[in-house]
Each structure stands twice: as C-alpha cells, then as structure tokens.
Amino acid sequence: MFQDNPLLAQLKQQLHSQTPRAEGVVKGTEKGFGFLEVDAQKSYFIPPPQMKKVMHGDRIVAVIHSEKERESAEPESLVEPFLTRFVGKVQKKDDRLAIVPDHPLLKDAIPCRAARGVEHDFKQGDWAVAEMRRHPLKGDRGFYAELTQFITFSDDHFVPWWVTLARHNLEKEAPDGVATEMLDEGLTRRDLTALDFVTIDSASTEDMDDALYAESTADGKLLLTVAIADPTAWIAEGSKLDNAAKVRAFTNYLPGFNIPMLPRELSDDLCSLRANEVRPVLACRMTLAADGTIEDNIEFFAATIESKAKLAYDDVSDWLEGRGSWQPDSEAIAQQITLLKDVCQRRSEWRQTHALVFKDRPDYRFVLGEKGEVLDIVAEPRRIANRIVEESMIAANICAARVLRDKLGFGVYNVHTGFDPANTEQLAALLKTHDVHVDPTEVLTLEGFCKLRRELDAQPTGFLDSRIRRFQSFAEISTEPGPHFGLGLEAYATWTSPIRKYGDMINHRLLKAIIKGETIARPQDEATVQMAERRRLNRMAERDVADWLYARFLNDKAGTDTRFAAEIIDVSRGGMRVRLVDNGAVAFIPAPFLHAVRDELVCSQENGTVQIKGEVVYKVTDVIDVTIAEVRMETRSIIARPAV
C-alpha cells in the first residue's frame, strides 16, 4: 500500500532536502575519531564508528546531526577519495594480503590482492604500489585495493629511493637509447679549440654543461664567452630520445644519485664538456661595461671548443682566497680564473644595484655509504667559485631572454610576477604595522617590488620577510616573455643546462633557428605544463628521500642531550617547525614542549610568534638550541624540544 505512494515519496524528498548537510575534507586523528573540515573556521566531529566508512583526506558530503548542543557528521557520499594510487607495506596473514598505506595518518591495513599480470609472490613487509578498488561510501562493504607493482623487499637498503620514486611515479633509471652520430643541422661552427675554456663544477660532476672563457679589452671592458653543451646536435626533435627527454623534463637529482634526462653516454660523455676533448657547443659572447652592464652587442653562435681544465669549486675558491695547496696547472688557467673573478664582481655589483640577489643559503650534501647509510651531512656554503658560475649563467640567460624576445617574441621563459594582486592591500597593511610603507599598486611593478625587497634585505632580521612570503606568487614556466620579479629582471630564459632541462633544449633549437635566419614555431604550452609538473614531483621526491635520510641520521640522537642550533621556520596552532642549521633537517616542536600550561600559550601562525603569558618568547627566524626528543621512523618525522 505504501509502495508507490506519491505523498510518502514527497515526504521522503522533503526530509532529505531539510536535513542539514555539509561538504568537506575528512581529517583523521590517532585516536580513532575524526573531523569534517568544511573551511578554515568550521569543522564537525566524526565519531569512531562513522570514521570506519571514510579515510583521512576523503572529500565527502555528510549529514549533520545535532544532539544536546553537540553537532556530529555522518558520512553520506563520496566526492573525491583521498587514496587512488598509493604506496605501502604489505601484510600477509594466513595467505591473505593487506596493505598499510605509507602515510602518517593512515594506519589501517586495507585488504588487497595482486592485480592480474603481477607475477611477484608478495611477502610480509614488501613495499608495493596499490590502487583502490572499493570504498564503503560507493556502496561497497569495505575498502579494497589491488597491488599493481612490487617495489622492493623490506630489507633493501635503498628503500627510501625506490619507494619515493614509485610514490611519485618517476623513472628509476637512465633512459635507453644511443645517439650514434651528430645531426647535419646546417650550422657553421667556429673553431674555438685554441681558447682556454674552463669548466668549474663539484669534484664529482660528470655532466659538465657549461665552459667559460674571459678576456679583457684595452678600454677596460670584459668579454665573456659562455659555451654550453649541445645535446640538440645529437638529438633530433620528435625522435625517440627527444620524446623521452620531453616526458622526464629534468634530470632528477636525489641525495646520493641522479636519474638523468638523457642517456648517460650523452649526459656524462658525448655532450659533457670534458677536459681536453673537442666538443660541439652553442655559445654566447657578451661585452661587460665597467659597471657590469651587458652591452647590446650580444652574439649567439655555434662552435667547437676543447676545455683546458676541469676545475672544482673548492679548489678555485681556496686559490682565490689564498688558502690550501691547490694551484692551477698553467699561467693561462690562473689568468682565466682571475678574469672570471672580475666578471663575477662586476655582474654581482650590477645585480645588487639594478636587480635582486638572493641571500646565500648553504647546500646540504648527504655523504652515503655503500648500503645507503648516512655517514655524514655536510653544509656546503656558496663560495666565490660557485658565484663565478652563477653570475656567468645568469648573465647568459639574460642574453638569451633578450635575443629570443627581440628576434622571435617567444621562448621558454621563467616568469615570476611577485605578489598576487589580490593580496597587496593586506601586504601593505601588514608592513605598515612594522613601519614599512608601500603603495599596494606600486609593489605590483618590477621597480616597486625590487625597492621593497631591498628594504627588507636591509632589515636586521629576516622576520618581516618571512611574514610576507605567503603573499607572493609562484614562479612559472611560460612561452611568453615576462618579468622575473624574484631575480629583479625584465626577462629570464634558461639555456645553460640542456643536458638536464628539456626547456633549455627547446631554447637551444630556437636560438639555432635565429643563428640560421630560419622561422620556427612557438613551443607548445603542453611542454611547459609537463615541465612545471615534473619540477614539482622531482622537488617532492627530493624532499621525501631527504626526510627519510634525516630520520636515519638523527635516530641515534633521540633522547640524548646532543644540542643542535635550529632556526624557527614556521609556527602553527600545534607548535613550531625548525630547521637544524648544521644539516638542514626539519623538526617539529609540539606546543606542550614549549610551555606546560596550554591556556598561557598562544601559537600564532598569522604573526609567526609564540607568546607565553602575553610575552613573545619565540618568533620565526629566531635561532634556538634544541635536542631531539624522538624520531618516528615509520613517518620519518623528527620531534625536538627546546634545550634547557
């Protein structure tokens, strides 16, 4: 009698439409309950039984129940699952398989089976790639996954690398393929093999892609010739090797080893500018005025060179600083180093005055043993030799940006527009509270941005700089010429690393078309999208491997009195994050470690400060001493506490 009753259907419909609902993201906790976060202000409690239907990170719609002043959420439908493809550790019990996702807030094992075509016999502790197949909110009885790829065994010393590369779906080895002979590009190459070109790199570098040669003129100017390795002399556009490089977009540099964009015989041999070997190059010659200005007579041309010395950063820096026992092999090489130092000083002064110079941060290098164990982590400060190469490359990239813009009107450009226009009013208000006055429209211009950056760089600490970072936009890769606010330049297009950046290979082909006087099509936007995505994934992979290695390195310091100097890099409601100065590891200090009485403690992300009883005790950029309280290997997180 009730089956087809229209009134009943209408009543059901009414009840359904009147029931309050909310859409948001599930946040799991370690206690079994969770929260539905609707926005920054509003969240609803999800009781433990209801959490069984969802997973941390799922975007869902939930019914909101109100009982005795308390609201709770009952998951109703799935908008977007958190897990689709993931990595994890296999559990095996009575021949039944399950997988625990490798994620700090996902602790539950998900029943699974090997997908069709996966031959591996999975054992307890194996690492695998899995894909979700069932979800309770899709009408399934429970969660279920399929194992689509075996990564490695639990006792493999190189787990951090293989698991991270699998997680981000990145290649594990160099691409296949060989380039047997140079292409006939119809380019006339100048013979510069007699000139004293030198390369300056880390001692262990094999893929040398830049060589430098400087000379002085009678009227006090400097001529700099930058010669860059020429992989596009071997790799035809649209060839198998080219397409593989296009997908990879970059060489992936991970702690301990790299996965090259090109086959190793190209990156480390045929294209590498090895000492005393004749190599084809794409070259740029520029004239530097006394104040470091790059004059208008920029020239790009194809050439052959023979590097006369493979120099190492530390040797060159020591020699220029009058330390150590290393000496250049000849007077000619010594003269080159001295001239290149002059080039560096002129360009550095020009950039200080007319553009922007990044503050020097050390690079951290992991020293690894045979089995991937971390023997040491070394902070490598940026010294004079690093700056010689950096200034030469930036100058060469400015030249390419100008020539591509003026001759073609397009290229592969690194573009950074400074601040997001939507944020400049807030930015000006924040700066005003610190007695720095800016015009919200003026900071959107290159000149206004540079003026503000110089003012911030002159501040006694980096505190204010850290506060405004969230208002900045991200750098992008674009085929359209545009300014790079971060560098303080009108245009910037890189072409100096074609062995390890596909965008630089594209710019090589464009520059060669200009040299030959040919027309050439604008690069496809898909290429720049792929580059941006790969850059993001490679950075995440590098960070993930580093986190794992930091946890291994500091594990034996947990619970000891060993003190580390640490810079506060972020404050959140739950505590603060710090970076250890000596090795670059990031650690978290939970709020209870800062002060025992929660009501007397205010951790403000907005202000970047921690107040105790109304007094600012810690702020971002402060350097404090910490000890390591705990290292959680399964989540690769390091917990620290202020040293007393």
From Swiss-Prot:
SMART domains: CSP, RNB. GO terms for molecular function: exoribonuclease II activity; RNA binding. Its EC number is 3.1.13.1. It is an enzyme of class 3 (hydrolase). It catalyses: Exonucleolytic cleavage in the 3'- to 5'-direction to yield nucleoside 5'-phosphates. One of its GO terms (cellular component) is cytosol. Gene3D superfamilies: 2.40.50.640, Nucleic acid-binding proteins. SUPFAM superfamilies: Nucleic acid-binding proteins. Its main location: cytoplasm. Residues 561-643 form the S1 motif domain. Residues 189-516 form the RNB domain. It is found in: Cytoplasm. Pfam families: OB_RNB, RNB, S1. GO terms for biological process: mRNA catabolic process. Keywords: Cytoplasm, Exonuclease, Hydrolase, Nuclease, RNA-binding. HAMAP family: RNase_II. Belongs to the RNR ribonuclease family. RNase II subfamily. Involved in mRNA degradation. Hydrolyzes single-stranded polyribonucleotides processively in the 3' to 5' direction. This is Exoribonuclease 2. It comes from Klebsiella pneumoniae subsp. pneumoniae (strain ATCC 700721 / MGH 78578). The lineage of its organism: Bacteria, Pseudomonadati, Pseudomonadota, Gammaproteobacteria, Enterobacterales.
